[in-house]
From Swiss-Prot:
The record marks H228 as: Plays an important role in substrate specificity. Pathway: One-carbon metabolism; tetrahydrofolate interconversion; Amino-acid biosynthesis; glycine biosynthesis; glycine from L-serine: step 1/1. GO terms for molecular function: glycine hydroxymethyltransferase activity; pyridoxal phosphate binding. One of its GO terms (biological process) is tetrahydrofolate interconversion. The lineage of its organism: Bacteria, Pseudomonadati, Pseudomonadota, Gammaproteobacteria, Pasteurellales. This is Serine hydroxymethyltransferase. Belongs to the SHMT family. (6S)-5,6,7,8-tetrahydrofolate binds at L121, G125, H126, L127.
Length: 421
């Protein structure tokens, strides 16, 4: 029998300690991983609701289980809010993740062995855009495009590759690209070779929802996203379209369920509904505007301190810092900053001489720090601290600089908590 006063702390102290330690880590570390964000207490409340218990195979109004009347309300709320948020005609809120959303799109539009054209992982793409280690590069014949030495997409190169390989589907989207993608140009290329245009907007969905980054819906046949990252909701996936083709919509529905998934995670769908409602609020646009302002402010500090920023700047929430000139590695920078309670991730940069697990750069993102209240002055100061640590790498004062920086980080984290008590 269950009682309301059952706790993890009493039942499983080892697990509870790990949860408490993670809570403390998030509060005492500055999070700059571009794909991470903080979900609101409302989102987490929905994830912990009794919908955790409910099986709901099928779609609203057409379920394979009884007792789904409230699950139907939740899922329809999420669908309707996502349609309003992004201007979509079709929405599927059931994908468990961005990768599963992408798998469902491939399954709906093309067949095994067909050719896809996507951005190279080493140039800022994603595993599911055709990387050979991913299902997308194993099931399908993947051809990859990249970026120029300046860190920009070369659309003529994309076009030439499309003309050569005649893909059935072109993937546009990224995991580490700091500029604005020309969705219209990508659609033009897709139309020229008779391919579908599939956009993965996972990294910039929040900016798009706020009207601060070009919306791909008017140009793409199908769009996917995660619901965390810039969007700031639960970890999950989403498929959208405004192509007007009912046959494509039907194929997408059946490709999610029953082809790729069984029962949806109704508690996560409830959390998605909360997230979409939050994103429709006026203050959400202000938040996303500050995300971009903070990224631009940090870029200027890195450049002033002598570090190269890929593409020379950013037009979204992230940027890449290259250490090729300094002879440093992303791995060493990642580790040193981590000791100072600043979390980033090592990342490959254009013409990177290092191996993928070493790299010559880091990726920096501002959604999390902005959500906890950092303003432009705060992030300029933060970028300066990061440069102090990077400047000291391999020198006698390295540990001293790291220790001094950590104290500054702890102080600002105390002033700007993630979840104020």
């Amino acid at each position: 029998m269950f009682t309301r006063n059952m706790t993890i702390a009493d039942y499983d102290p080892v697990l509870w300690q790990a949860i408490q330690d993670e809570n403390r880590r998030q509060e005492e570390h500055i999070e700059l991983i571009a794909s991470e964000n903080y979900a609101s207490p409302r989102v987490m409340e929905a994830q912990g609701s009794q919908f955790t218990n409910k099986y709901a195979e099928g779609y609203p109004g057409k379920r394979y289980y009884g007792g789904c009347e409230y699950a139907d309300i939740v899922e329809q709320l999420a669908i309707d809010r996502a349609k309003e948020l992004f201007g979509a005609d079709y929405v599927n809120v059931q994908p468990h993740s961005g990768s599963q959303a992408n798998a469902a799109v491939y399954g709906a539009l093309i067949n095994a062995g067909d050719t896809i054209l996507g951005m190279d992982l080493a140039h800022g793409g994603h595993l599911t855009h055709g990387a050979k280690v991913s299902f997308s590069g194993k099931i399908y014949n993947s051809v990859l495009y990249g970026i120029t030495a300046d860190g920009l997409i070369d659309y003529e190169d994309v076009r030439q590759k499309a003309l050569e390989c005649k893909p059935k589907l072109i993937v546009a989207g990224f995991s580490a690209y700091s500029q604005v993608v020309d969705w219209a140009k990508m659609r033009e290329i897709a139309d020229e070779v008779g391919a579908y245009l599939f956009v993965d907007m996972a990294h910039v969905a929040g900016l798009i929802a706020a009207g601060l980054y070009l919306n791909p819906l008017p140009h793409a046949h199908v769009v996917t996203t995660t619901t965390h990252k810039t969007l700031g909701g639960p970890r999950g996936g989403l498929i959208l379209s405004s192509c007007g083709d009912e046959e494509i919509y039907k194929k997408l529905q059946s490709s999610v369920f029953p082809a790729n998934q069984g029962g949806p995670l109704v508690h996560i769908i409830a959390a998605k509904a909360v997230c979409f409602k939050e994103a429709l609020e006026p203050q959400y646009k202000e938040y996303q505007a500050n995300v971009i302002k903070n990224a631009k402010a940090m870029v200027e500090v890195f450049k002033q301190r002598g570090y190269d920023v890929v593409s020379n700047g950013t037009e979204n929430h992230l940027f890449l810092v290259s250490f090729i000139k300094q002879g440093l590695t992303g791995k060493a920078a990642d580790a040193a900053l981590g000791k100072a309670n600043i979390t980033v991730n090592k990342n490959a940069v254009p013409n990177d001489p290092q191996k993928p697990f070493v790299t010559s750069g880091i990726r920096v993102g501002t959604p999390s720090v902005t959500r906890r209240g950092f303003n432009e002055n705060d992030v300029r100061e933060l970028a300066g601290w990061m440069c102090d640590v990077l400047d000291a790498l391999g020198k006698e004062n390295e540990e001293q600089v790291i220790a001094e920086t950590k104290e500054k980080v702890l102080a600002i984290c105390k002033r700007l908590p993630v979840y104020p008590k």
